[in-house]
């Protein structure tokens, strides 16, 4: 409504898990309230990402970002679904998520899940242009701040949108 996602549903048939959120009413997993993780920085975190298979021109800076983050976090996960990765952020299963070149239908539901679970979602510069750029960072505010400061050093100008 008016350009805002009001209701989100992400279903994982492999685990029979239904993630839901309604703006202003919180996020749930199979009826249980979700609150995202509480990591203070990147040390010991599990991060999720996807790879820009249609945006090969960004491969080098993106791999540089992954490499730099790899030295600061505990591990990476990749489900193959931005919506599910964001649902996992909302559930606290992973601490943060970042990816480039997404379409709104890839992340709109997951974005609301993260926000309703107490997290934030930004573009790669910490702004709110992710629906236009398709570049997204999500997690609790401290994790997002740490991700952004680490990523900025490696991003090409084309990704700073």
Predicted features and spans:
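Alpha-to-beta junction loops
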Residues: 91-96, 119-120
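AMP-binding (ANL) adenylation modules
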Residues: 125-130
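Short beta-strand and adjacent tight-turn residues that come in two discontinuous sequence segments
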Residues: 99
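Small-residue (primarily alanine) positions within well-ordered alpha-helices
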Residues: 8, 110, 117-119
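Hydrophobic residues within well-ordered alpha-helices
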Residues: 87-90, 111-116
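Acidic beta-strand-loop-alpha-helix segment within the catalytic core
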Residues: 1-86, 133-161
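Acidic donor-binding loop at a coil-to-helix junction in glycosyltransferase catalytic cores
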Residues: 105
């Amino acid at each position: 409504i008016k350009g805002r996602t009001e209701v989100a549903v992400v279903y994982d048939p492999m685990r029979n898990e239904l993630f839901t959120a309604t703006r202003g009413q919180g996020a749930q997993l199979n009826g249980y309230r979700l609150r995202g993780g509480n990591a203070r920085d990147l040390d010991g975190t599990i991060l999720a990402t996807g790879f820009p298979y249609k945006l090969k021109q960004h491969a080098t800076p993106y791999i540089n970002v992954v490499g730099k983050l790899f030295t600061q976090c505990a591990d990476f996960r990749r489900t193959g679904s931005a919506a599910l990765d964001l649902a996992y952020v909302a559930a606290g299963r992973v601490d943060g998520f970042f990816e480039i070149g997404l379409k709104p239908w890839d992340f709109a539901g997951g974005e609301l899940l993260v926000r309703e679970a107490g997290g934030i979602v930004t573009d790669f510069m910490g702004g709110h242009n992710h629906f236009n750029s398709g570049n997204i960072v999500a997690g609790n505010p401290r994790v997002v701040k740490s991700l952004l400061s680490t990523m900025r050093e490696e991003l090409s100008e084309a990704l700073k949108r």
